[in-house]
Regions:
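N-terminal Rossmann-like dinucleotide-binding module
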Residues: 1-64
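Short acidic low-complexity segments
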Residues: 68-80
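Glycine-rich, N-terminal phosphate-binding loop of Rossmann-like dinucleotide-binding domains
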Residues: 88-89, 370
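C-terminal capping/lid region of NAD(P)-dependent oxidoreductase domains
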Residues: 160-164, 368-384
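C-terminal glycine/acidic-rich active-site capping loop/insertion
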Residues: 231-234, 238-239, 247, 251-254, ...
Length: 384
């Protein structure tokens, strides 16, 4: 038996909303026959596209087989046959739209960061709980092949006692001149529009650290706006008011130390745009978006510092690939299936808006640390 579930998808005219959420998740789920449920039935998503640009919505609809679309959020929310509201639009507008959807009784699934402020994010979580609707936040990094292999190592005890985690994320985002358009929208570089790499990436680092290694207990951060001006989508030069690089340190539960560099102003000399090294007493691993490599204690070379002679050790040769041993689906699609299944069955969904609140909280405290030039404790949230 097939069951329909209507999904209002706000923000699909943007790059992530279109490519990852609509095309590679919802439409791919439809193409594959829906989401299989424990009772043998199948849940089939039926999206309606929501946005402000009628021309773009019509073009997307036509490209993908005549999908439903609309430009009036109130009208879309008034349809009782569409029971899920998804938001991947501008962060600054998310609270207003999500609260409106909660009031209409819709289940909520949204991109991170869920808000620009912890207080606003908490209002969304509290409202969703009080309304009794299911709610979730996108945490795609947890479902990437490289991270899932790393989680397998942690669960197996490969590292022994984990000592430290070091992450490098970023790439050069073109300024918009020299005939090279920027790979990110201009609002990302305007603080007043909800931009900034701390707000964007520390939400990722929070759930990645919390769910893989241990709860973040304190943070120390500094950041910068390295590129003072850029060229926007219309060819106009504008001032950058948001941070484009951040350098964070985190103390985790279990006496694990982590440090992450996040930058839109760095040129890549590593295997992937994001790489994370984990060091433990028994072994180490380097994980990227898709690959993961390990070096056990017994395979660790014994270098001796001597800058007067050429290095004789090829350090990369001493690392072993972790095999897939499974088929890895698109990370966004995996989490969409989990959320839709949780709505249909009532089963727990751990990646709720409260988890999204924690990401905003860490970003806010990191910004405070940067401005006050000190370590800041990260308190537990009152979710009652």
């Amino acid at each position: 038996m097939q069951r329909r579930i209507g999904i209002i998808m706000n923000g699909v005219t943007g790059r992530m909303g279109l490519n990852q959420h609509l095309v590679r998740s919802i439409l791919e789920i439809r193409k594959n026959g829906g989401v299989n449920l424990p009772d043998g039935s199948v849940l089939m998503p039926d999206p309606i596209l929501l946005g402000r640009n009628e021309e773009k919505l019509r073009a997307i609809s036509n490209q993908y087989g005549g999908l439903r679309w609309g430009v009036d959020i109130a009208e879309c929310l008034a349809n009782p046959d569409d029971t899920v509201y998804f938001d991947s639009g501008t962060t600054a507008l998310r609270e207003k739209n999500v609260l409106q959807a909660i009031k209409a009784g819709k289940h909520i699934y949204c991109e991170k960061p869920v808000s620009t402020m912890t207080e606003a994010a908490m209002r969304m979580a509290v409202a969703a709980d009080k309304a009794g609707v299911r709610h979730g936040v996108v945490q795609d990094k947890l479902f990437l092949p490289g991270i899932r292999k790393l989680q397998r190592l942690v669960k197996a005890g490969f590292f022994g006692r984990i000592l430290s985690v070091r992450g490098e994320f970023g790439y050069w985002v073109f300024e918009g001149d020299l005939g090279q358009s920027g790979q990110r929208p201009s609002w990302n570089y305007r603080k007043e529009d909800g931009g900034g790499i701390i707000l964007d990436m520390f939400a990722h680092w929070r759930y990645l650290l919390d769910h893989t290694f241990g709860t973040v207990e304190s943070v120390c951060c500094t950041a910068a706006t390295h590129i003072p001006y850029r060229v926007d989508e219309s060819g106009t030069i504008y001032d950058c008011t948001a941070d484009d690089a951040a350098y964070g340190m985190f103390q985790l539960r279990g006496d694990i130390f982590a440090q992450f560099n996040s930058s839109w102003t760095t040129r890549v000399y590593r295997d992937e745009l994001f790489c994370m090294q984990v060091d433990g007493t028994e072994g180490s691993a380097v994980a990227g978006l898709r690959e993961c490599r390990t070096q056990h204690r017994v395979n660790t070379p014994r270098p001796v510092w001597n800058p007067d002679v050429s290095n004789s050790i090829c350090f990369r040769d001493g690392w072993i690939d972790v095999p897939d041993n499974a088929e890895f689906k698109n990370a966004f699609k995996v989490q969409w299936e989990m959320f839709l299944r949780a709505i249909a069955t009532g089963e727990p969904f751990p990646h709720d808006i409260w988890d999204g609140v924690r990401g905003v909280q860490l970003a806010e405290l990191a910004i405070k640390s940067w401005h006050e030039r000190r370590w800041i404790d990260v308190p537990a949230l009152d979710t009652e």
